[in-house]
Each structure stands twice: as structure tokens, then as C-alpha cells.
Amino acid sequence: ACVPVYEECGTPKKRCCEERPCK
């Protein structure tokens, strides 16, 4: 299942199925 993760650190922007979640 796709998990929404943050596209950019500290931003409300989210993307689905990000290869590498922001750490």
C-alpha cells in the first residue's frame, strides 16, 4: 500500500510511494 511521506522536510507537501522518506 502507498504511504504518504513528506516530499520536503518541514513542509506540508506530501507524496505517495516516495522511494526514500525524508529523515
UniProtKB/Swiss-Prot annotation:
Pfam families cross-referenced by the UniProt entry: Toxin_9
Molecular function in Gene Ontology: calcium channel regulator activity; ion channel inhibitor activity; toxin activity
Coiled-coil intervals: none
Tissue/organ expression: Expressed by the venom gland.
Compartmental location: Secreted
Annotated disulfide bonds: C2-C17, C9-C22
Superkingdom as given in the UniProt entry: Eukaryota
Keywords: Calcium channel impairing toxin, Disulfide bond, Ion channel impairing toxin, Knottin, Neurotoxin, Secreted, Toxin, Voltage-gated calcium channel impairing toxin
InterPro entries: Spidertoxin (IPR004169)
A GO term from the CC aspect: extracellular region
Described purpose of this protein according to its UniProt entry: Antagonist of L-type calcium channels (Cav1/CACNA1).
Free-text note on domains in this protein's UniProt record: The presence of a 'disulfide through disulfide knot' structurally defines this protein as a knottin.
Protein name listed in UniProt: U3-ctenitoxin-Co1a
Species of the source: Ctenus ornatus (Brazilian spider)
